[in-house]
């Protein structure tokens, strides 16, 4: 009975001791959560694997201890996960970067951790010193124009204000003879302008099927006639156009003396007329039509009109001649080549309605002249005279249409052009 009381008292004492130790272990665990082994007296204790080293009952392993089979009952580190951890003092024991020298480096996951500019907001910018960090080429205003030192990269002729009009400084680019015409004409395609580069009137005339001849209105004659009441005759000017597309091909300019034109009969006065292809200067004509002063009476001393080629450095070369034989009631003309051989002639009556009563309407508007081959006597060309509405303002202004029909030789075509001009000058150019 006594032994039972002693054992009961001893059990109470052991129970109280265990409870105290349990409270101490709980406090230790709370401290170890912040500093796992900071206050652990056993961390450097070689007897740390002997949990009951300070237990006075260590020699009595079976002294009625209810936890006698629990080796950790008195172990203050029983809940310490680091009790057997050799790195218990290493704060990085659970740190996967324990061997990483940059464990405390906030940029440990930063691919630029070795970059001395890791704290530089421009670390990823190769132009970190460039204030235009978002635009690597921001200092280059020509980033979209790599050749901006050539400011006209996209427009090679940008500095040339005439980029769309390479010859814009030449106001007559589209109309080479603009100074000699009254109305602008559409510029032909390059294939039709090849003659301008060769500057050869033969090349211009060869493909033509016909020409339109328009006499230009001279306001000086109009003012002299209707304002001053004086009949003065000034030099004539003609435009020679392609009959198919109305494109200007030649310009004919008369250069006669004022006294001769106004004082001598038409058959007697000297004639000097220049025919120029477009783009040529007046001092470098293609064809020169000349007639000397002559004293012509009926069939005596009939005039001779000579045509010269001036295209070869202004060297005169005779192309042919035109002679008007005497006739009472008809228009007669003979055309001769350079060898003085008759090639074409015209013999038409002068009794046409448009000749007797010229008016710009009805059957009085047109006059027809037919040119024939000197050998076959077949018709090879047709000249039609047209009376324009300007006839009411200037009575001696006329237009002509010349169809070459069977004529292929460019020299013959030029002779027919000169003949048409001479016909208008002799018979229809009134003083």
UniProtKB/Swiss-Prot annotation:
Region named Disordered: 20-139
Annotated Pfam families: Scramblase
Residues that span the membrane, as ranges: 412-428
Classification via SUPFAM superfamilies: Pentapeptide repeat-like
Cellular compartments annotated: Cell membrane
Catalytic activity: a 1,2-diacyl-sn-glycero-3-phosphoethanolamine(in) = a 1,2-diacyl-sn-glycero-3-phosphoethanolamine(out)
Cofactor(s) in the UniProt record: Ca(2+); Mg(2+)
Superkingdom of origin: Eukaryota
Keywords: Calcium, Cell membrane, Lipid transport, Magnesium, Membrane, Metal-binding, Transmembrane, Transmembrane helix, Transport
A GO molecular function held by the record: phospholipid scramblase activity
Annotated GO biological process: adhesion of symbiont to host cell
Gene3D superfamilies attached to this UniProt entry: E3 ubiquitin-protein ligase SopA (2.160.20.80)
Subunit structure of this chain's protein: Forms homooligomers in the presence of calcium. Interacts with mouse carbamoyl-phosphate synthase CPS1; the interaction is involved in the interaction between parasite sporozoites and host hepatocytes.
Its biological purpose: Catalyzes calcium-induced ATP-independent rapid bidirectional and non-specific movement of phospholipids (lipid scrambling or lipid flip-flop) between the inner and outer leaflet of the plasma membrane resulting in collapse of the phospholipid asymmetry. Preferentially, mediates calcium-dependent phosphatidylethanolamine externalization. During the liver stage, plays a role in the interaction with, and thus invasion of, host hepatocytes, possibly by interacting with host carbamoyl-phosphate synthase CPS1. Dispensable for host erythrocyte invasion and asexual parasite development.
Family the entry assigns: Belongs to the phospholipid scramblase family.
Name of this chain's protein: Phospholipid scramblase
Species of the source: Plasmodium berghei (strain Anka)
Gene, per the UniProt record: PLSCR
């Amino acid at each position: 009975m006594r032994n039972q009381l002693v054992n009961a008292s001893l059990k109470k004492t052991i129970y109280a001791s265990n409870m105290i130790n349990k409270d101490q272990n709980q406090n230790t665990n709370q401290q170890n959560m912040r500093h796992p082994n900071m206050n652990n007296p056993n961390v450097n204790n070689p007897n740390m694997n002997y949990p009951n080293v300070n237990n006075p009952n260590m020699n009595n392993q079976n002294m009625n201890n209810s936890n006698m089979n629990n080796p950790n009952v008195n172990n203050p580190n029983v809940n310490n996960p680091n009790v057997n951890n050799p790195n218990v003092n290493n704060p990085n024991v659970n740190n996967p970067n324990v061997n990483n020298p940059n464990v405390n480096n906030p940029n440990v996951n930063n691919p630029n951790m070795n970059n001395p500019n890791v704290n530089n907001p421009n670390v990823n910018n190769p132009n970190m010193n460039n204030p235009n960090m978002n635009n690597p080429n921001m200092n280059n205003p020509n980033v979209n124009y790599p050749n901006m030192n050539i400011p006209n990269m996209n427009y090679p002729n940008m500095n040339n204000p005439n980029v769309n009009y390479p010859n814009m400084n030449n106001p007559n680019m589209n109309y080479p003879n603009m100074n000699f015409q009254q109305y602008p004409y559409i510029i032909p395609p390059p294939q039709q302008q090849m003659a301008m580069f060769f500057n050869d009137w033969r090349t211009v005339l060869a493909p033509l099927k016909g020409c339109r001849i328009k006499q230009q209105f001279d306001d000086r004659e109009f003012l002299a006639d209707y304002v001053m009441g004086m009949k003065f005759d000034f030099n004539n000017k003609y435009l020679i156009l392609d009959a198919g597309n109305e494109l200007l091909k030649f310009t004919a300019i008369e250069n006669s003396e004022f006294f001769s034109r106004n004082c001598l009969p038409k058959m007697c006065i000297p004639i000097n007329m220049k025919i120029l292809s477009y783009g040529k200067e007046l001092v470098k004509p293609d064809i020169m039509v000349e007639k000397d002063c002559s004293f012509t009476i009926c069939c005596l001393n009939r005039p001779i009109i000579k045509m010269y080629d001036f295209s070869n450095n202004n060297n005169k070369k005779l192309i042919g001649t035109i002679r008007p034989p005497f006739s009472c009631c008809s228009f007669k003309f003979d055309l001769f080549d350079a060898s003085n051989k008759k090639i074409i002639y015209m013999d038409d009556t002068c009794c046409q309605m448009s000749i007797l009563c010229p008016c710009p309407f009805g059957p009085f508007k047109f006059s027809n002249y037919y040119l024939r081959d000197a050998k076959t006597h077949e018709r090879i060309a047709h000249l039609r005279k047209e009376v324009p509405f300007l006839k009411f303002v200037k009575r001696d202004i006329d237009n002509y249409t010349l169809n070459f029909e069977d004529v292929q030789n460019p020299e013959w075509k030029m002779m027919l052009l000169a003949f048409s001009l001479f016909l208008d000058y002799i018979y229809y150019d009134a003083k």
